[in-house]
Amino acid sequence: MATDKGLEDVPEGQIESNYDETVDSFDDMNLKSELLRGIYAYGFERPSAIQQRAIMPVIKGHDVIAQAQSGTGKTATFSISVLQKIDPTVKSCQALILAPTRELAQQIQKVVIAIGDFMNIECHACIGGTSVRDDMKALQDGPQVIVGTPGRVHDMIQRRILKTDQMKMFVLDEADEMLSRGFTEQIYDIFQLLPQSTQVVLLSATMPQDVLEVTTKFMRDPVRILVKKDELTLEGIKQFYIAVEKEDWKLDTLSDLYETVTITQAVIFCNTRRKVDWLTDKLQARDFTVSAMHGDMDQTQRDLIMKEFRSGSSRVLIATDLLARGIDVQQVSLVINYDLPANRENYIHRIGRGGRFGRKGVAINFVTADDVRMMREIEQFYSTQIEEMPMNVADLI
């Protein structure tokens, strides 16, 4: 596959767009009528910035690199493109979508199924932590779209259970995250096992060297689309901080907040799994109802907790960054960073949840003396202001 040297001279891990056409209505994209029906039924009215720019080149068959964060509508961008390109009458895998976490893969699967509701297609999630036998059975039925995590997908292709001969499109979502989690080898292997003619679509919030290497090795003359940070979703989200002198005082601060704020639904982020468990125990001991979720839990447990949270029967979810990218709960109006994220890129993944697509939200950051520098960095990185939390914060939620 051809290399694209132009990508290597990019400043600060940001790609340069080389494609600027926009289509600002779904009706003007020449989509199948059943697909269009699914898009509107899903609740979309007009395309977001990335959808206006990226859907058309993908549908036209170009390899596409899109740099965009969560909350920009990127999942629907490639879901719509995939659904437009596949042939529902052919019962075999025509599109493969890889994601870094099981939660994200399942979320993508839900979007594909919902938007493709009138199209008579099958979409199967091929993820670790589930029964291999069930996977094999589902794959033998020939679902047109597979969404999965690299380990399990690689395994199924190697066992020749997932057949790739009809593959038209390969989508890598959150490529930076997948490569930083050590999936590089499996991803390279999967590329080698796909037909030469497979179209490649890569989405990534950042463009570190390892992502650029994938694009140069496996993509042909790609269309590059950068959705700049100012089009992203900190807009509409009120961001505050509470100065907490010592780490030990955070728990009391959180308990006081619980009293003040009768929260609709909230996610509280901690930086480690142990901290999540510790905080959950402490809050439950104080008779607060909270649920917790992190990567040490098995899949069944995680699914159950997400289900309870989505349905509203559990109100407060304590989680690690692993889940910042997999939680898409429309009614979350409050995010609390009990710990500031260890890297600034994760800040938008955490709080971009609360205000997606113009929904309002509030983010409250607990900031110790040691965190002040990181908070300033976050403000600078996102060109945003995080202000001290006012007394009447309850009125804002």
Swiss-Prot record:
Motif (Q motif): 24-52
Catalyzed reactions: ATP + H2O = ADP + phosphate + H(+)
Main location (coarse class): cytoplasm
Helicase ATP-binding domain residues: 55-225
A Gene Ontology biological process term: cytoplasmic translational initiation
CDD domains: DEADc_EIF4AII_EIF4AI_DDX2 (cd18046), SF2_C_DEAD (cd18787)
InterPro entries (alphabetical): DEAD/DEAH_box_helicase_dom, EIF4A_DEADc, Helicase_ATP-bd, Helicase_C-like, P-loop_NTPase, RNA-helicase_DEAD-box_CS, RNA_helicase_DEAD_Q_motif
Keywords for this protein: ATP-binding, Cytoplasm, Helicase, Hydrolase, Initiation factor, Nucleotide-binding, Protein biosynthesis, RNA-binding
Annotated ATP binding sites: A68, Q69, S70, G71, T72, G73, K74, T75
Keyword Nucleotidyltransferase (UniProt): no
Entry's EC annotation: 3.6.4.13
UniProt xrefs under PROSITE patterns: DEAD_ATP_HELICASE (PS00039), HELICASE_ATP_BIND_1 (PS51192), HELICASE_CTER (PS51194), Q_MOTIF (PS51195)
Sequence similarity: Belongs to the DEAD box helicase family. eIF4A subfamily.
Subunit comment: Component of the eIF4F complex, which composition varies with external and internal environmental conditions. It is composed of at least eIF4A, eIF4E and eIF4G.
The name this protein goes by in its record: ATP-dependent RNA helicase eIF4A
Organism (species): Chaetomium globosum (strain ATCC 6205 / CBS 148.51 / DSM 1962 / NBRC 6347 / NRRL 1970) (Soil fungus)
